[in-house]
Every structure is written in structure tokens, then in C-alpha cells.
Amino acid sequence: DELLPNLQYGFDYKMIEKNFRPILDDMIGEHNVTGCFLQRSIVPLNIHSDWENNPNEDTPGYAVLFPLQLDGDAHTIVFKETSHDKHPNDSNKITNYKFSNEDLKLLGHVPEFRLQRVSEPKKIKWVLGDAIVWKRAHFHCSDNFLTGDTKYKDSLVLFTTK
């Protein structure tokens, strides 16, 4: 499993809904939260979509990540491409996108096979108190935060449906 040795602790959204519903309503409009978890990342996550992480037949909406704590710099990187598959695969076209040297440094943990199938990386720096939002079908990943001074990063992640 690609998640290990990172940690996730899922819990019932009802425990925080009173405080978070108004924030989410302002950001993404009407929604249902179907996934709610705290996450500690100690290794960078590879390119994936969150489409498959859906417990019901509703259409996946957004992933909302709230950075909670980190000991250095970190980014979430969201790509132009979307998929209902978990990872880029042979069914995804090769994009021939030319990544910058900065991009390649941030994406140093990603195998070339996957990089060939994504383009136009949007690099979103983690800032405590901010929220990072993307459609769950979009391919995304963490940056290769271990190349800097960052040893861990903690977040609250919510998955929504329409």
C-alpha cells in the first residue's frame, strides 16, 4: 500500500461539522462530507486521484485539505488531468509536458511513467490556517518534501460528494 508508513485516522465528520460546515459552504457550496480523517505524512505521496475513495453512489466532489502542523516547507501539487482511476496508467495519454527544473525537484519521488501522463502542475504551498481544495478526479500528489528540512506534515482531509 502506498500510504504506509504514513498514518491516517478516520473519524465521524459530525464531530466537527458545526465548526466546519460554514467554512466549506463558503468555499465549495452545497456538499456532503463522506470522508474525514487526520493524516500524518512522513513519506511523499505519489500521483493519484481521490475518485475511488467513495463510500456511496454519489458523485465525488472536492477534496479539502487543512494543513495543521509541519516542520518545514511542503506543497500539494494538482495536475490538469483527471481520471476515475486511482493512478495514471496506460489508458492515460502521454502529455509530452516539459517540466521545469523546479518542478522536477518537487516531483523527484514520482516515477517517470506517471510524470509522462500529467501536465501543468499547480504547486500549492502549505500555509497553516489555509485550505487547499481540488476536485477529487484531478491527479495530485505531495511534493518531495524530504529533500528539504521537512520530516513530517499533519493535515485534516475531507472528501465531499455532490
Question: For each predicted feature, which ranges?
Answer:
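Catalytic core of non-heme Fe(II) oxygenases with the double-stranded beta-helix
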Residues: 42-138, 143-162
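Non-heme Fe(II)/2-oxoglutarate
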Residues: 1-47, 82
